[in-house]
Amino acid sequence: MPRKFLGNKIEKNVDAVRPSSLTLTADDLKYIPPIPQDFEDEDDKVLRTSNGGNRLSKRFGGTLKLKKRLESVPELFLHDFKKRPRSQLEVIREKKFTDMQVPKGPVCPQSTILPLRERKKVKSLPIQRKSLRRPTLSKPAVVQSLGHKTHSDHIIDKVFVSRPAPIVMPVKALTPINPVSLMQTQTQDCCRKNKYGKSGSEILFDEILSAYENVSTSDSTALNSEIDRIIDICASKQIAKKNEAFQVPYVVCPDDTETLFSSTTPKLKPVNSNTLNDVISSPEYTTSGCSTYSDQSNSDEELSEVESIVWNTNKRTMRSSIVSESTSEEGYCTAAETLPSTVSVEDLDIHNKLPKVAQTSSCNTLLNKLSIRKLKKVILDPPKIMHVMTFDDDSDDGDDNDDEDRALNILQKKIDCIEIASCSSSIYSE
């Protein structure tokens, strides 16, 4: 089947072929070929290889060897692992354990152990070794006598104790350390360990670190006590400043010359905070009229003599008016409302001199409302209506033409008589 990619069409008889069992018809089934008689012999030939091994047909999934390999992968791995080349050290260790195998006897009670040991003879077992570098001479076998064996029996029995002795770890006692000697030993050890030695800066750095690590406790306590003393002094100064914040000297009698001309500092007494608050003016602002005119009253010295006289005469009336206005519901007043002007419009005698406005028409009132600067005179030409002549007009009678001319003249007169009352800033005229 050819290879297909994304977007390629699949052909019916090329890419997808139906199996033969589905393509059989009734006529094909009528003519089935006969089964051969020597089928078994052919089957044996097919299932056997030239080497004598059995194999399956390719139709049934491949050879028997492939099937065995897939089913026994761990066994094949171990088989290959054993065939792998190994070093000579591994061979020596393996032979040592195989040669030194001793058969284990049955478990006997302790009473029968001693006669069995006497019967057995001590035999020397030669040890076979393979050296990698050069061969060495074989050591002579050591033969132990029976007398030596009997003497060692009671020693062996003493080894097997029912309860072993408790293990106690050694405890190191703390000893006072001299920092100078410790630094010297550390520098000597470092020089011995490092064949080439450390640089001068590294040795100095190690000495500084060791000196800071082994600081005596007496120095630290002295430093802490000094810090505490300075903190106490600072705290006491702050308390003294708070107590001496508001103090007033005692009033001394002027006749007492001793206290006036003495070199000592005068005696002080603390001041109550309530009295200070009463003396100091508050920074809050008020909306009453008195506060607004307090600044003006302070500026009387800057005014001239005439203005000061006028101001003093009107001060009472102004204060009374301010108090009355401050008690009103609004609670706010301006300078323009409170200050009385010297000349008022009502006092002027000009009402009779003002011209009286006469009643005029709507057109005149419109002209009066408009400003004179914006008025412009515009001349409009009357529209001229011309009668359009056509070919059909020649055939009409003269009476019809006269009637049309009369109607146009009447309409023209009406248009000329119309007065346009415009709201714009221009006057229309013929």
Curated annotation (Swiss-Prot):
This is Protein DSE3. The keyword Nucleus does not apply. Induction: Expressed periodically during cell division. Requires ACE2, CBK1, MOB2 and SWI5. One of its GO terms (cellular component) is cytoplasm. Keywords: Cell cycle, Phosphoprotein. The gene is DSE3. It comes from Saccharomyces cerevisiae (strain ATCC 204508 / S288c) (Baker's yeast). Disulfide bonds: none annotated. Coiled coil: none annotated. It comes from the Eukaryota.
